[in-house]
Amino acid sequence: MNHEDFSTVSTPLFSALQKEADSGRTSFHMPGNRGGKAFPSPFSSGFAGLESTELEINDDLNEPTGPALLAEEKAAAFFGAGKSLFFTSGSTVAIYAMLATALQPGSRVAASAALHRAFAQAAALLDLEMVFLPMTVPKRGADGRGDSPSLLRSPLPVIDTPRALKLLEKTEGLRALIFSAPDYYGHVDLPQELLEAAHARGLPVLCDEAHGAAFAAAVEIFPKTALARGVDLCVQSAHKTLPALAPASLLHLSHSYLRRCPEAARRAVAARKLFQTSSPSFPIGASLDFARAYLESAECREKIQLLLDHITFLRQELPPAFQVLPAGPEDDPLRLVISCRSSGFSLRELSSGLSSLGIDIEMADFSRLVLIPSLDQPREDFMRLSAALRKLSLEHKGVGRAEKPGVACWEEGSAARAEEDLQRWLCRPRAFLKPRAATFRGLFSKVDWPGVLSEQGEGDESLRVTSVIAPYPPGIPLWLPGEEITRRDLLRLLDLQAEGLHIPPFTLEKLSE
């Protein structure tokens, strides 16, 4: 691989690929787009021009020794990791590799119930047994997470730390503790007491930090990173919040974990080769290199401060029916969560209304809009968002209602009931679970939802889930393969889908089968 000295270059991988693209070389190798030359302009002049394959003049993204390795080392230095690995196949693959690095097949793990569906898939592939930490719904307005009188910034349940500590103490055979933080609403639920208790028992702590890739850029503004809290391995989705191509992601291993487990670095590289494509994308890898360099720049810090100013501006400009929910000390201040509970809009009405006005948002639940501003989002976009919400408010038949009646309506209405049901499902007691067998049976299942509801059955009759039930976004499983679900809950899911919640189809099997 390339042994040219890129060690002093701020973006070694990006620069090496750019040098190759500018060299005028003749390509008789894959990919068939000839380094992007086969594409029409402007596509050919963009990142597609960095398309390449593993050559002597660049590097191997799965086993780097040249510019790609230098780029990973620069990422590790910036993020505070002992080792960082680039993934061009997304955080799902990085999560598979993280678990395979830390755990033997068949291991028992304790995990937050608010994990991404990728963990359920990884548990099936690695035959892991999952033990779920007890969850609870925080009191409204507690810990800066909500505004008076009631709405929480994040409706997701949080870990019940006292009960979780007891579970760690009494559960035998645990091999790891797994968190997901921050969540889709930007809230970090990573109790330090649990992390320390896990380390005291010799357990590695793993974290899906997909939404926290920007935190290292301004430690005085953002919550502490997972690595800074003492997490041993974590995955970040660079493409979610940074200027990187989708699905660019990173896997970090901490210094302390590598001291305790020197073989982990080798295992991580081997796990990446096991799960990632053998043709990783050079443009995506280069964008990871660029994103890290951008986070290190003075320009990035200036953009972050500007973004905070833009959010303050938006808070002042929104119509009365909408409110930017304040960020507490454990919330991402750049994650824009807007309450719409007193607006009178349904989820579908608000999503389609904004779309019709040219505003595309990340997610809407039954009471909130969730927006992910890019680090360089201009003030004009916030002005346009405010104008769109004002226009919708004026056009809506419920315009002019006072705030209190709106809140009361929300408290008594279907949106509040929907939120309560989702919280109840995530907080329910759950048995130890090995989802592998049910997951692979589900590939052949002929019973699906909602089709199964056309059959006769009692409301309390149970069926076994054989594929993940996870509204998307945010992709948090309500049921995992191997768990039982009643027809009553299946019907309730159908109601929620009719109200605007996107629930991908899933498979089931009858308990008699």
Predicted regions and their residues:
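Conserved C-terminal alpha-helix-loop-beta "cap" of PLP-dependent enzymes
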Residues: 319-483, 488, 492-502
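A short linear hydrophobic-aromatic micro-motif
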Residues: 83-85, 236, 358-362
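Short glycine-rich or small-residue beta-strand-to-loop segments that form or flank ligand, phosphate
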Residues: 58, 85-87, 177-180, 337, ...
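Charge-dense polyanion-binding interfaces
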Residues: 502-513
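N-terminal "arm"/small-domain region of PLP-dependent enzymes with the aminotransferase-like
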Residues: 1-66, 472-474
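Conserved PLP-enzyme active-site core in the AAT-like
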Residues: 10-18, 22, 42, 81, ...
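Conserved N-terminal alpha-helix of the aminotransferase class I/II PLP-enzyme fold
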Residues: 47-90, 114
